[in-house]
Amino acid sequence: MKEIKDFEKIKIKIASPDQIRNWSYGEVKKSETINYRTLRPEKDGLFCERIFGTTKEWECYCGKFKSIRYKGIICDRCNVEVTHFKVRRERMGHIELAAPVAHIWYYKYIPSRIGLLLDITASSLNSILYYEKYVVIEPGDTDLKKMQLLNEDEYIEARERYGMSFNASMGAEAIKTLLENLDLDELSSKLRIQMIDKDDKTDKKLLRRLEIIENFKVSGNKPEWMIMEVLPVIPPEIRPMVQLDGGRFATSDLNDLYRRVINRNNRLRKLLLLNAPEIIVRNEKRMLQESVDSLFDNSHKRKVVKGSSSRPLKSLSDALKGKQGRFRQNLLGKRVDYSGRSVIVVGPELKLHQCGLPAKMALELFKPFVIRRLIESEAVFNIKRAKNLIEQEVDEVWQILDFVIKEHPILLNRAPTLHRLGIQAFEPVLVEGKAIKLHPLVCHAYNADFDGDQMAVHVPLTPSAQAESWALMLSTNNLLNPANGHPIVFPSQDIVLGLYYLTMEKKNIVGEGKKFLNFSNVILAINNRSLDYNASIYVKIDGEYKKTTAGRVIFNEALPKGIEFVNKTLSDLELQILISKVYVVHGSSTVIEMLDIIKELGFKYATKFGCTISMSDIIVPDEKKTYIDRANKEIAKIQNDYAKGVITGEERYNNVVSVWLKTNEELTNKMMEILKKDRDGFNVIYMMADSGARGSRNQIRQLAGMRGLMAKTSGDIIELPIISNFKEGLSVIEFFISTNGARKGLADTALKTADAGYLTRRLVDIAQDVVVRIEDCGTINGIKVETVKNGEEILESLKEKAVGSYSIERIKNPITGEIVLDANEEISEAKIELLEKIGIEKLVIRSVLTCEAEHGVCQKCYGRDFSKNKPVNIGEAVGIIAAQSIGQPGTQLTMRTFHIGGVAQAGSEDDKISLKNAFILNSIEGFNVNVDNGILFTRKGTLKIINVFYEEKIKNIKEIKVLDSQRVIKGIPLFVNKKGVEILSSYIGYAKLRDDKFLIVSEEQEVALKAGTKLEIGVGDYVESGKVIGTFDPFAEPIIAEVKGKIKFKDIILGTTLKEEINTETGNVEKRITDNVFESLDPRIFIIDSSGMEVASYVLPGDAYLQVEDGQNINIGDVIAKLSKGSEKTQDITGGLPRVNDLFETRIPKNLTEMAKVSGIVQFKSIQKGKRLINILDEYGVEHKHYIPAGKHLLVRDGDVVKAGDMLCDGRINPHDVLEILGGISLQEFLLAEIQDVYRKQGVSINDKHIGVIIKQMMKKVKIVAVGDTNFVYGQKVDKHTFYEQNRKVIEQGGEPAIASPILIGVTKTSLNIDSFISAASFQETTKVLTDASIAGKIDDLRGLKENVVIGHLIPTGTGMGLYKKIKVSENIDAKV
């Protein structure tokens, strides 16, 4: 039997008048609701029983028929059908309108749909509908034009002049006639011709008109249906009227709105019968139009209709819109029965899969199950008696409850549920009291603590729901974080401290240096008090004695069998690494066993350690005063430079901040060093921080070092630091400065949490229909991944980037030629290690970004599911997981400022350049000049170097086994030394013989240098690691003379382009180029040689400080002008979250850079309209124009050679430019890198594939640039797959395909343009989405998750996938056991 649920698609259309009459069970003629005496509905009123059905079950209105046996009979007296009262939720009525009215959605919303069809403006349309102007419908043979508007006087004049030879009218009747007369086919072809004539310049209005006309044609809707003759009346149960205690009635606002419509309609009908004067009728029609507008969308009107308490009435649209609307409040978020909530407390005695459930709560939740068992066990014979027993709480009830909850999982949820681990299943254990007990190790997944947090309990009822809870949601099946595959169930705080204490080593204590044959002897010695936990001992393990400690023996003895001996001090990170390792090697069951052991041990030894903290544990370094004095001296020097005018105010500020940051860092290092040595490393504060149990280096710095610099509310750093720490106590001024940061922290947290929540919501909306649908899409495209480095520091290894993905190409060992990795093979941890060993640093892998699956993604392109560490299953909702993985840390990061209490965090800039590895300088690129003792870079430059990994003097070598410049990989023989030992390589690189040394060096690498860098080494030099090779000014960018000569100013005019400011602090005159832009003036400096020739020209950007005078003689390398860097801002995620928002919304940055559109030679041209024209001459001699706002600091000079995509001036990159100039793949890489950068800076690890899923959705659409023989419109934005499908059909028929270019759309816009109108409507702009969908007659295929939740289907992922719906379970009787 087919149920109403068995449908696969939903279509939305505009209802025709006949359709509305068809739905209706009768016309509502009166505005009455119910009779005040009988409290029964009035006949023909808004609650009429004849129309909407009976209010009493199986009884007619007059009471003639009273029983289910008369079902379906219509009473001959009152005409009410004998039926179920629930029909009052389904039956609709209608109102026949005395005059047509326009639907507000189609005429008032911008762009006005009726206006677009008829090509009239919204204001003109309003004036027609509200009976202010006439519109000419048929001009006949007069001078009037069709669609011309006439006011009253013009109309009277035209009537006198032309008589009845033309037709003009007003109101919705006129618009209806115009819409009926439209020929859509003719209009469509006319507009298409206009579009082609316009060529490149797409007219948005034309495009919109064409789209709306095509939508009407395809959907079968008629334009005149946007004008209503019949108004549907929704069922009365949906707009109920209920009696309150005081005898008064509360009614839905809709009833008031309907009453206004009916009253006005009836009055209009009467006026028409009486042939009332036109002006009165017209006014009544206008009021009818207004009342219908209010009914459909009251909040959209300029004058809102208000109820008795002067509150705006809630119309039909308002019931759908917003957070409290039908979609978000009732369809997507429902209240759940069989649920409860209570405070949580810690349950250290629980196993990982258990939770403690208060007995009282359990009894209430499992009541029906208990009742059933009571009846089955014949303790009682009816439900009423069973309920009584339960209320009395007899012993039998508790026994049955124990039996019922055994192996019946319950779900625990903590709000806010930021990712899927916010709901997990546990087996309940009955506990006394009223609090839920939670296992301490799952707190991290819930982000729960025990300071009053509450949690909700839900009971899965059906066997299938219980099975899913056991198999998929049990806490022991959720050990890994879906965002990155790291363990999410790991010990913290007390447990960590206990294990750290247990596994630490201490000198000179009982039992030190003893030897033991086995573990049990060690434990015996400890129990006899002849051995201390932290004593260093020797134990026989696998046949040989190993140096370890007694505590480590206890730890290893407790671990499950088969785990390698752990011989180190365990901090929280070490424990996480151990858990990961055990998971990979031994699987989840061993990890679960191990986690409970770790928990027991941790709590036990934390208790035994019983650490306390006192003032004497906080040690302030004696060197503090020295450091502070030194900083003050440096600052005095900076102030002195500023007073002399050597540096600008901004540079002074930046330098001061930098000095304090450096001093604070040095002091902290010293403090940590002292704490580490204190009590042999057993200083409690140091132990807490070092183990990762509580507190951080940053917090200890404030206790024992100095509090440091604070941030202002604006994010600027206050240059006066707090020199005291909390042990010494703060002075009044220091305390005052502190309050600023502390308040900022709290305010930020509150505001940003909402922001991050909204980001998650948008991401979920855009990605909710991305599900793994097929095994392999068969693509041959992939993306290139390599190690992410910052200088020489590895930020993300190749392993992190590529593990769990599938390869695109086959990779062979460069030396043996054997296949290491085949195409389409999963890249496992072992494979990565093999690849790294043979020196492979770049890989091309399959990625969600290049997946060609029509809907969702395929298994191979997605790769590994990180929550299981296995290839992803078909049916996994990877879109939602991606959105949660990105949004969840967003919310976490907003909390960061809170804990440090507003202490400023910014990198202190170093003015010296040194590299970690030793290296050889191969070559120098970029403009540079020789100055005394070095090379000065006048513009940005690059050093090409090779790093030296290994060196050995040739005199120590007997025989070299490799050739010069030969590639070497790990494990191959390099040479035989003088002792005859063969030395194997532990590095990947190239062998190099240089002078008297044998080296292993890297491939050539680039080191970028800033303008103004002075280099102290030369080409070919061998430089030791850590040696300073050059210096630069980190806070200013200089413009440097590249030739010798005399300065000549051009367009530098005081008061116009030059501003002289007297510095009030120093009394010096500072000359600054203004930001004002003048067409004719282009401030620049020429250098003139001895013959009077101009040999160099330098453009001066706005805000540049001049360092020279007109006519001054200058040498090579002198600074002409300099630009100060903006003052340091504190970098916390408050900078980061808005950045992520901007990237996902693809907003154009404020301070925009201009990118070179092509590769070629730069040519400077004039300034036009405040913008400097720069041409780039490409290889074919074609000029490409670039306009850059004058006053911007240019990064190129006349004659420079640039590559496409190079930045021409400073500023932020616009992602849309990246797409246009460098293409889709570069854009994907750019967005991925930018978003990852924000999260990485905060130490948050998110796998690339999650961000990839979102970016893929943002690039789903293409823009048509050539129509060909398809039905597309020029400039239209269509889905990629729709585009390919249409083209395929056209090519098959021998036609010309369309051409499109890729576009990038932000997440909000993408969510609104999603294929499913139900999903889009439930996101934002509900009424707009539904308006457009109804015109287009859209069909929702119910592919995504949201639309299925809204209509009450199972979601089409996992066990709810279509694949599994048709599976029938058959019993095979003959099956052999």
Swiss-Prot record:
Q: Which residues bind Zn(2+) 2?
A: 777, 851, 858, 861
**Which SMART domains does the record cross-reference, listed alphabetically?**
RPOLA_N
Q: Cofactor: bound how, per the entry note?
A: Binds 1 Mg(2+) ion per subunit.
Query: Which catalytic reaction applies to this protein?
Result: RNA(n) + a ribonucleoside 5'-triphosphate = RNA(n+1) + diphosphate
The cofactors required by this protein are:
Mg(2+); Zn(2+)
Q: Where is the signal peptide?
A: none
Where is Zn(2+) 1 annotated to bind?
60, 62, 75, 78
Q: What is its EC number?
A: 2.7.7.6
The entry assigns this protein to a family as follows: Belongs to the RNA polymerase beta' chain family.
Role noted for this protein: DNA-dependent RNA polymerase catalyzes the transcription of DNA into RNA using the four ribonucleoside triphosphates as substrates.
Assembly and partners are described as: The RNAP catalytic core consists of 2 alpha, 1 beta, 1 beta' and 1 omega subunit. When a sigma factor is associated with the core the holoenzyme is formed, which can initiate transcription.
Q: What is this protein called?
A: DNA-directed RNA polymerase subunit beta'
